Amino acid sequence: MTTLICCTDSNYYLPTTNFNYASMKMRIFFFSLLWFIVTGIKAQDIPSVPADSAYGVVSVSVCNMRAEGKFTSGMTTQALLGMPVKVLQYTGWYEIQTPDDYTGWVHRMVISPMSKEKYDEWNRTEKIVVTAHYGFTYEKPNEHSQTVSDVVAGNRLKWEGSKGHFYKVSYPDGRQAYVSKSIAKPEREWRSELKQDAGSIIHTAYTMMGVPYLWAGT
């Protein structure tokens, strides 16, 4: 059945057809059922965390940890390159726990999952610690070569050797690079020189004057 709808502003009539409400209800039911089936399949496809992969190490300079597994969720804290973490669950994002017991969700691209054996091996191996506020690692022992990644203070990389003014290092995900000795040092040496008195802490704080503050930053 066709009716006419009057449009007074333009002074013309538009034909329209009455809705078949029964047909519309069937379509709504069908698409709702299809949506539940698809989401149910997706839920079944989400892998659980195997017992031998319930550990990991951060593989980017700064890893943002969020309250939920999505980019729009608020940041709770940050984890740094080389930090060992426990993997609590995986739903497309990893829920992780840091050594200081903070928990949060991180994107799967920023964590290198490991077996307990490889995780323990990473923790035992000698590390190079970045001491400068910011810098880069390179493909060759030359600052004019291709960069591998950025690094920030506190980042830890596996020490593979030395070449000239550079340390050869490797990442948790297997990448290898060179970092200048001017911005990093062996972890044992760094720890032996570390001062935690009030004067040293204040001095370090002053070196960050003018750096933007980030809520939940590390």
Placement of each model-derived feature along the sequence:
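Bacterial Sec-dependent N-terminal signal peptides
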Residues: 1-49
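Residue-level signal for pocket-adjacent positions within structured domains
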Residues: 60, 132, 174, 179, ...
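Catalytic cores of peptidoglycan-degrading enzymes
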Residues: 198-218
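Acidic/histidine-rich, surface-exposed loop or edge segments in extracytoplasmic proteins
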Residues: 62-63, 185-186, 208-211
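Short aromatic-glycine-enriched beta-strand elements
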Residues: 92-95, 164-168
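Beta-loop motif signature
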Residues: 48-51, 57-87, 130-159, 213
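Boundary regions of SH3-family modules and the immediately adjacent low-complexity/disordered segments
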Residues: 44-53, 98-129, 142, 146-147, ...
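Post-signal peptide N-terminal segment of secreted/secretory-pathway proteins
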Residues: 70-109, 113
